[in-house]
C-alpha cells in the first residue's frame, strides 16, 4: 500500500516525505516493442543523478538529475529487431541503484534471416579484404553482429577478422599466410540478443557456415 501511495503522489507531482537516500520500485522494466515513453519513479531525501550506463540511440531520458521524490521520463523508439536493453544508473550520495530497461523483440527468432550467399572462398596467400554477399532482415541490429571463426589444424592464431557488416555484405580481412601450407577456417555471423527480461544471458542466432581456404 505504501509503494502504491508513493507512486500516485509522484505521478501527481505532489511533495512527499521519504526518509531514505535512494529507492526505486524495481530493478527491471519491460518495454513494448512498439515504442513510447514511461515514467520512472525515483524516491529520495536528497539530490540524485541518473545516466545511461552505455549510450543507446533508441532511448533517451528527459533529465540527468533531480531532488527528492520525482520521476524521469524514459522514451524509446520502436524495436524492429531482437530484444535489447539499456541500464539506467541512479546515484544519491554514496548509494547507487540500477534499473534495467528491457525492450521486447519486434521480430520472432523464427523469422530472422542471416544468410551468407558465398558458401566457400579460395583465398590468396597474400591475404587482404573479401566481401561476402549477405542477406539479413536484422538491419537495425547490425552493430551487434559478430564473426565466429573456427580454425582447422593445430595453429589457432587468428587470421580472419571482421571489418564490417551491412544489410547486403560481410567484409572480412585475411592475414598473409606465412606458414608455408594451406590453412582453413569455418566462418559464421552471429547475433546475440538480451535474452529474457530478468536474465543477463542472451540468445544467439547464427548464419550459415562458409569455408575459407587460404593457400
Language-model segments: which ranges?
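Short beta-strand segments of immunoglobulin-like
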Residues: 26-32, 117-124, 160-161
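Proline-enriched interdomain boundary motifs that mark the N-terminal boundary
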Residues: 19-27, 109-118
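A short beta-strand micro-motif common to beta-rich folds, especially ectodomain repeats
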Residues: 82-94, 180-195
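Surface-exposed binding patches on compact interaction domains or structured appendages
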Residues: 39-73, 138-171
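Short coil/turn motif common to extracellular beta-sandwich-like domains
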Residues: 33-37, 69, 125-129
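Interdomain boundary/hinge segments at the C-termini of tandem beta-sandwich modules
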Residues: 101-107, 210-215
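Beta-sandwich strand segments
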Residues: 98-100, 195-206
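Bacterial Sec-dependent N-terminal signal peptides
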Residues: 6-32, 203-215
